[in-house]
Amino acid sequence: MSFLFRKNGSSSRRKIKEKLRGRHSDRGGKREEDERYGGSGSDLPPPPSPWGFLFPEDFVRIDGNLKAVIVDDEGLDVIYWKKLLELENSGKIRKNPKPRRRGDKSGDGFRRTGADQDDNDDGDDEVGDESIEEAFSFHVKKSQSASSSGGEIRDQSNNGGGGGGGGGGGGRYYTSSSASPSRPSSSSASAASPSRTSYATSAGSDYGGGGGGKQSQSKFQAPGGGSFPSSPSQIHSGGGRSPPLPLPPGQFTAGNASFPSSTQPPPGQYMAGNASFPSSTPPPPGQYMAGNAPFSSSTPLPPGQYPAVNAQLSTSAPSVPLPPGQYTAVNAPFSTSTQPVSLPPGQYMPGNAALSASTPLTPGQFTTANAPPAPPGPANQTSPPPPPPPSAAAPPPPPPPKKGPAAPPPPPPPGKKGAGPPPPPPMSKKGPPKPPGNPKGPTKSGETSLAVGKTEDPTQPKLKPLHWDKMNPDASRSMVWHKIDGGSFNFDGDLMEALFGYVARKPSESNSVPQNQTVSNSVPHNQTYILDPRKSQNKAIVLKSLGMTKEEIIDLLTEGHDAESDTLEKLAGIAPTPEEQTEIIDFDGEPMTLAYADSLLFHILKAVPSAFNRFNVMLFKINYGSEVAQQKGSLLTLESACNELRARGLFMKLLEAILKAGNRMNAGTARGNAQAFNLTALRKLSDVKSVDAKTTLLHFVVEEVVRSEGKRAAMNKNMMSSDNGSGENADMSREEQEIEFIKMGLPIIGGLSSEFTNVKKAAGIDYDSFVATTLALGTRVKETKRLLDQSKGKEDGCLTKLRSFFESAEEELKVITEEQLRIMELVKKTTNYYQAGALKERNLFQLFVIIRDFLGMVDNACSEIARNQRKQQQQRPATTVAGASSSPAETPSVAAAPQRNAVRFPILPPNFMSESSRYSSSSDSDSES
């Protein structure tokens, strides 16, 4: 096995030597087999070299043959492999006449390696060691045709001084040689090949920058009847020190591409990188396989599919036919025992594709690196004829291609009559296209999804969801859900959609836009705002909620039709400011470009400049009747309440009892001997409790007034009885009489609240609202007058109705105002009558509130007294029965007395004994006066 490296200085030579020595041992003339190619080691590829060089284990040795690879300075471009044994046996290869530096020399002029060479040679400055020596260089005659079978090779050896080292001058190449065991090969002869002999396959002087010495040439015939590249430009595509020579027409070979020697892809197919295919599985036509996909050796791929990148397949596959329209891509290590190949015109092979050195490629096919696959072509695609040779005036050589995963295609060669098909365009960086879908039918899940999609009707309205926990009935037991499936109930779907569906409202026919209406009549997309956009949107929401057109609104303003209060309130609420109204009226642009609210306001104000003033007056007209009626009712209630409080009655008796009780309790203090008290103290009577905490001052006062009124009622009753000659109460005891007085007085005091009905109503009137209502009515009447004054000479139906309303409202409001002044004076007098200084308070209706609360407290006290009285009546029969058993001589009449006391009196009417009470109260007041 032989490798050729460009001379690259002592440092690079030392690195090359260390790499070759570490990976390839030649001690004893025996080469250790690489585990990658036949050993038992790992199948992983060797780590990339930091200098970009390729090493022996990256290539397979063919029995009886030597592979020679030329690598440039950066290790990018691989030229080709060659069977050198046939050339050596035929005498067409001349051995190196000038062995490099020191070392054993054989009789044939070649440097010996392995056991014949010292293994511990560590000279860094010497290139010639056990694994590196100078090689020959071959060159094809420029006159030799690429398709001729008798191509010759000439040897070019730079014998001159000039450039040496660093890859810049000299142009010499070196090869590493090693002995390897022979393997059977179908393409090699039985004769053994001297493995120490090295051969070169490219001209070093063509790459150098400064070698100017004499060159010796010898012609050689290319093996297999093929031809070698005609210039270094064909075998070197990157990193050269000088511009490469022009390529032959239609050819392009990228660096680092070594082709398998026996894999002949059929026309129309290709294979992606790092993929070695099985020995008996040809891909069907129209398919391709990418690298790194582990394929079986006999599994055919269905149409439209391909394996993924870097498939690790069998490495001993025979020729794998590829259909037409496909090609073999990057870094694909194929089988190593195939027939020689030559590259016809119109084809090129970009870099990094490990292909066979003698695999014929039909026209129309090419090999690319890191490029997406081309679309498959027909199975029996015929190759186009090769292009004619270039004319005498050849174009200048193209610039060297940039370093990258793939080199661009060369420019089309000039032809005289006709040119071949142009090279394909550069592949995109997005990678190969996705494989076509499986031609088989849909899967089960796909069928399910399709079935579900068929049941969904896009026009069916969507209903509101019902959030529940879905359950599956248990088939192992009987459940209620098993009986529901076969039920006969069916709901009304239309009704359910109407109630729970999200159905878009269709516009009415009157508001719908005709189909033949032009786009210019509709609202433009770019709207113009006179008002603030946010304010305009808010007004538009209100206007749309009314459901009225601008014509209906204008008709309402001009004719004065009756409208609902809510509608007029919304229209009056969106009134713009005077400045905004001026801007809207002065707008001289296209009204159709205005926003919805701005456009509607523009048309309304243009038709009726005082539109929103009319809305306010019309709203006042509608609400005037209810507001005036409420105000009149409040005035009547206040007047009646004042009259109730000024009448002398039971309320005076209660105040008298409270005053006397307070003076008795405050005797000897500054608060005692009072002549009057503030009525706010009435609310505090229930807070003063007795010593035993069983009663309050309020209960005591009310009970005393009840007893007093009951006694008065009993006296009046006795007077009437004495006139009739009956004396029913003469035989009653004092205790029984007290109970009788309380029973007769409770209905009298309990009916006090009914005598102050208007007082309790007046307490519910808010003083601020009462005053503000009258002021608001007067203000709106003035606004109506102002509107009518501004509209003089502009009479319409609406203004006529407003004038009639104004005349009646103005007169009525004057009467209400005067009545209100009179009643408020009455309220002030009543307040001063009960408590002096109360006029300083802000709320003049506070007196009514205090008395209402006190009357409620009195009613509660009466209820408590009646409850206690019933308890005493229930305990009295038991005591009487015990007394009767101890004194049996008691008369039946006395024993029957407890039964008489157990009788419950009926509830008396509210005004019972009112006349007698009034008479007695009047007599008392007269005596006091």
Curated annotation (Swiss-Prot):
Residues 116-133 have a biased composition (Acidic residues). SUPFAM superfamilies: Formin homology 2 domain (FH2 domain). This is Formin-like protein 7. Belongs to the formin-like family. Class-I subfamily. SMART domains: FH2. The gene is FH7. It comes from Arabidopsis thaliana. InterPro entries: FH2_Formin, FH2_Formin_sf, Formin-like_plant. Residues 12-22, 92-103 have a biased composition (Basic residues). Residues 159-172 have a biased composition (Gly residues).
